[in-house]
Each structure stands twice: as structure tokens, then as C-alpha cells.
Regions:
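The feature captures the beta-strand-to-loop junction immediately N-terminal to the Walker
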Residues: 44-46
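Helix-to-loop junction immediately C-terminal to a conserved catalytic motif
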Residues: 59
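Conserved ABC ATPase signature
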Residues: 142-146, 150
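Helical segment within the ABC ATPase nucleotide-binding domain
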Residues: 182-196
Length: 246
């Protein structure tokens, strides 16, 4: 960690980010948020609010028209996506984005494609098999034949293969049985609480997302409209009316 980040305790800082797609559709309008070192933060909002756009912008897959992104005390909005992975940023994308014709093992090795140390790559492979034992059982199976829950485990495990310090997850519960979701969230909470992994979690399941995080932000039509501790957001009239049906 850089001295600046260590002094402030902030790992990620998004400052007044504006993002628009080529059609001119504005997706983010002056978004600012912070994630502190070792913190788990939830980003919630309805479909089309801009949650996925924000994660892609942080990961370097989209470029902001204006605003700044800082990571570990350094400005990174001009840094290419693969180089952001080297900095310790990993994204588990919505819909998993697996290579369906490749095996589980081959998908996992793609998570370490920039690591030339075979011993370290094997260590990480054993580590993710320990977190998700079913993947060891399916190691030679094509990713396209996995169940939804197994596919999500593989997507998360692939991201963990890069040894991230900052992990972003986009709708990890989408299309998965509740008991599998609980199992996946348990693993993420263990990594966060026991190993200090910093997490930014995007979820439409607002209670589950806020239960897994210390703080949260509410994104609405490209703008942050609320932020606070998880409990304060659960208690807020805005969240209760818009997302909890109360």
C-alpha cells in the first residue's frame, strides 16, 4: 500500500465521475464514493441505475468523460484494464462471462495469465479449490456444463486467482438458488473478515447486500442518492420504500 493510501485508509476513491455511452446515453452523473482498506461496501439500486457501468469504469473497461479514479493513493483512470489487475483490482462480472468450451482448470488459469511463476499459480489453484471444493470435482469438466451456482463459484474463483486486494462483484446472486447464494456469501465474508479482502458488492437483493457489508451507497439513474452504514440504509425511508416494499 502506498504511504498516501496508508495515511488516509482509503483504497478506492471515485471522484465526480461522469460516464456516457457512444450513443450519448449518460450512465453516471457526478458519482463519488470511497472504499476504505479492508472494508466491504454494498452498491445497490434498480436495474439501469448505473451499477454495472460504475464497476466497469473502476475496472478500466469503460473510460469516464470526466472525473477521477484513485486506487491505493494513485490516479488510475488512465491505466489500462490489465494493468489494473496487476495493481490488485479484480471484477466478477454480471452473468459470469466464463469460457464455456474451456475446462474449469483452463478458466481458472486465465485468472493468472500475467503470473509467470508456476509454483504460485499452483498454490492459488489449491487455494480456490479449498474455498470451492466442488470445482476440484469438476476440474476437467467444460465450464458450459456447470450449474448456475457452480458457474458463479468458478467466476469468483477465477478472479481470486489474480490475488486481488480489491474485489468487485456484480450481481453474484443472479439466477442462483438461495442456499448456494448463502454459501457463496459465506466464503466472501470469510475472505473479508479473516483475510482483510476489500470488497465492493453490487446486488439487487438489498437486504443480502447490506448484511454482507459495513456501508452502502444507493445509486439511482446514475447518481448517488444515499449513503451510510448498512443499518442506517436499511432503516431509511428511501430504501424501505424503493427496495424493500415497505
Amino acid at each position: 500500500m502506498s504511504p498516501a493510501a496508508q495515511a488516509s485508509g482509503v483504497m478506492l476513491s471515485v471522484r465526480d465521475a461522469h460516464v456516457a455511452y457512444g450513443t450519448g446515453v449518460v450512465a453516471l452523473q457526478g458519482v463519488s464514493l470511497e472504499v476504505r482498506v479492508g472494508e466491504a461496501v454494498a452498491l445497490v439500486g434498480a436495474n439501469g441505475a448505473g451499477k454495472t457501468t460504475l464497476l466497469k469504469t473502476i475496472a478500466g473497461l469503460l473510460s469516464p468523460r470526466s472525473g477521477e479514479i484513485w486506487f491505493d493513493g494513485h490516479r488510475i483512470d488512465g491505466v489500462e484494464a490489465p494493468d489494473r489487475v496487476d495493481l490488485g483490482i479484480a471484477l466478477v462480472p454480471e452473468g459470469r462471462r466464463l469460457f464455456s468450451r474451456l475446462s474449469v482448470a483452463e478458466n481458472l488459469r486465465l485468472g493468472t495469465f500475467r503470473d509467470r511463476d508456476p509454483k504460485r499459480r499452483q498454490e492459488m489453484l489449491e487455494r480456490v479449490f479449498g474455498l470451492f471444493p466442488v470445482l476440484r470435482q469438476r476440474v476437467d469438466q467444460r465450464a458450459g456444463t456447470l450449474s448456475g451456482g457452480e458457474g458463479q463459484m468458478l467466476s469468483i474463483a477465477r478472479a481470486l486467482m489474480s490475488r486481488p486486494r480489491f474485489l468487485m462483484l456484480d450481481e453474484p446472486s443472479l439466477g442462483i438458488m438461495p442456499r448456494i447464494v448463502d454459501s457463496i456469501l459465506d466464503v466472501l465474508q470469510m475472505l473479508h473478515r479473516q483475510e482483510g479482502l476489500t470488497v465492493l458488492l453490487v446486488e439487487q437483493n438489498v437486504p443480502a447486500a447490506l448484511a454482507a457489508a459495513e456501508r452502502g451507497y444507493v445509486l439511482q439513474t446514475g447518481r448517488i442518492v444515499a449513503e451510510g452504514t448498512s443499518q442506517s440504509l436499511l432503516d431509511s425511508d428511501l430504501v424501505r420504500r424503493a427496495y424493500l416494499g415497505m
